[in-house]
Swiss-Prot record:
Similarity section: Belongs to the long-chain O-acyltransferase family.
Record GO biological process: biological process involved in interaction with host; glycerol metabolic process; response to hypoxia; response to nitric oxide; triglyceride biosynthetic process
Entry EC no(s): 2.3.1.20
Pathway the protein takes part in: Glycerolipid metabolism; triacylglycerol biosynthesis
GO molecular function, one term: diacylglycerol O-acyltransferase activity
Protein name per its UniProtKB record: Putative diacyglycerol O-acyltransferase MT3584
Enzyme class: transferase
Organism: Mycobacterium tuberculosis (strain CDC 1551 / Oshkosh)
Catalytic residues in the record: H143
SUPFAM superfamilies given in the database record: CoA-dependent acyltransferases
Keywords: Acyltransferase, Glycerol metabolism, Lipid biosynthesis, Lipid metabolism, Transferase
Any single GO CC term annotated in Swiss-Prot or TrEMBL for this entry: plasma membrane
Length: 497
């Protein structure tokens, strides 16, 4: 075994320790491709053969030093001297011609199986048999090895903007990229990002971010110069959130407003994955009509889809579901244009039947939350976010115990929206049609929705516990129908009514 070793950091250890038979801590991506005109019939075989003959570099060649004991105090990443690329690169086929729903079935099954932590924890699956001669690539990796942001960046670097490029390196030929502060400040349509910039794992980043937020609180309180000011500002913000009577702050969502819901139960190991893709211009046009962001529109149609989906299951709460959102905001004490990563809570308007009024409710709550954060300095933002999320620990404990508390929950699900490549990308001449994030779920979070923009489209990845939420594909379809209803609605209803 190689003598070089890299210790796992606290965040990586958190995801390793969270691994269980029902809560697998891997994330992934699904990318359908269309071959170029005149492509040979064995194009995918050639790509698989090329992949298996490639050189693998770190971190893709690393395995755990003590896979038999995940809690080992000196757990590290070491080079796997017996690395077997044939194990990690796999090929399968749908019954041709397969459609998007049929593609979701094997991806759901693959995502339901844990990675072998005795080996470098990643796999890539080439799936052929899609209608029109198309194929798909599904990649999954353990969050402790590659965080979602880094993984997405490496995947993007392994694709080319040139359809004639046949020499571009594959993702496991690319070492870990550097990460600049600017990378974490990109956003689309209103500033929602996946936690601290990660792309593939909305829920995972929220949980991981909570550790950083708690550390941020400690940093605030541990600073002699800033503790008094920040603590006072935090207290003032919390009080103001309760006392504000103006229209904007009346819509602020607190940390104990989420109804008890089927989404907040214990989960099994089985997963179901579904996708949807919409033109960004369509969402922008609706947002412009109602003075809402792209993210507001996305949340509203998710709310509309969930309203119908849960109603059909007989599980629709009387009160609206509450969503947790990672956001980027500019603190009031930052004159240099820097941003702070935080979390907010917002309504999904699942208690509202009218699509326009649902969008109005969503927009009002996100505006109030972001306005609240903009009134604070950076330290107070971190402390406020930690305080806002603190009751989630009680929610998780009640879920695990099976005893519902008499008070509401903190949030019902996580939604993340992250920027992806603006240009069309190719692998060996085949055009990537979409990039769907495949995130993770956990106890008390049986559903996660992660969005990613790509080449003028917005791609939705729905991942859920199959046993808790049967027929998840219907939710994806209902989200599209909610978009159609919103687009067809009479604009006279407006946000001000």
């Amino acid at each position: 075994m190689s003598q070089t070793a890299r210790r796992l950091g606290p965040q990586d250890m958190f995801f390793l320790y969270s691994e269980s038979s029902t809560t697998m801590m891997h994330v992934g991506a699904l990318m359908p491709f269309t071959p170029p005109s005149g492509a040979p019939p064995d194009l995918l075989r050639q790509l698989v053969d090329e992949s298996k003959a490639s050189e693998v570099v770190e971190p893709w060649s690393l395995r755990l030093s003590h896979p038999e004991l995940l809690y080992h105090p000196t757990q590290s990443w070491v080079v796997d001297d017996n690395f077997d690329l044939d194990y990690h690169v796999r090929r399968s086929a749908l019954a041709s011609p397969g459609d998007e729903r049929e593609l979701g079935i094997p991806v759901s099954r693959l995502h339901s199986h844990a990675l072998d932590l005795r080996r470098p924890p990643w796999e890539v699956h080439f799936i052929e048999g899609l209608e029109g001669g198309r194929f798909a690539i599904y990649i999954k990796m353990h969050h402790s090895l590659i965080d979602g942001y880094t993984g997405q960046k490496m995947l993007a670097r392994s694709l080319s903007t040139d359809p004639h490029d046949t020499t571009h390196p594959l993702f496991f030929n690319i070492p870990t990229p550097g990460r600049s502060p600017a990378d974490t400040q990109d956003s689309v349509g209103g500033g929602l990002i996946a936690g601290a910039g990660n792309v593939l794992d909305g829920l995972g980043d929220v949980v991981r971010g909570l550790g950083g937020l708690v550390s941020g609180v400690g940093s605030v309180l541990g600073s002699v110069a800033g503790a008094g000011r920040s603590t006072f500002e935090l207290t003032k913000a919390l009080v103001n959130a309760q006392l504000r009577s103006d229209h904007e702050y009346r819509n602020l969502v607190g940390s104990v407003q989420a109804p008890h819901c089927i989404l907040n139960t214990r989960i099994s190991r089985n997963r179901r994955f579904a996708t949807q893709q919409y033109p960004l211009d369509r969402l922008k046009a609706i947002g412009a009509q109602y003075d809402a962001t792209i993210n507001d529109v996305a949340l509203a149609i998710i709310g509309g889809g969930l309203r119908r989906f849960l109603d059909e299951l007989g599980e629709l709460p009387n009160k609206s579901l509450i969503v947790v959102l990672p956001v980027n905001v500019r603190p009031k004490d930052d004159e240099g244009g820097g941003n702070a990563v935080a979390t907010i809570l917002a309504t999904l308007g699942t208690d509202v039947a009218d699509p326009v009024q649902r969008l109005a409710a969503v927009t009002a709550s996100t505006r109030a939350a972001k306005a609240q954060l903009r009134s604070m300095d950076k330290d107070a933002i971190l402390a406020y976010s930690a305080a806002l999320m603190a009751p989630y620990g009680v929610q998780l404990a009640s879920t695990l115990s099976g005893v519902k508390p008499p008070w509401p929950y903190t949030f019902n699900l996580c939604v993340s929206n992250v920027p992806g490549p603006e240009d069309v990308l190719y692998v060996r001449g085949s055009r990537m049609e979409a990039s769907y994030p495949v995130s993770l779920v956990a106890h008390s979070q049986a559903l996660n929705v992660t969005l990613q923009s790509y080449a003028g489209t917005l791609n939705f990845g729905f991942i859920g516990c199959r046993d808790t939420l049967p027929h998840l594909q219907r939710l994806a379809v209902y989200t599209g129908e909610a978009l159609d209803q919103l687009a067809a609605a009479d604009g006279a209803a407006g946000l001000g009514s």
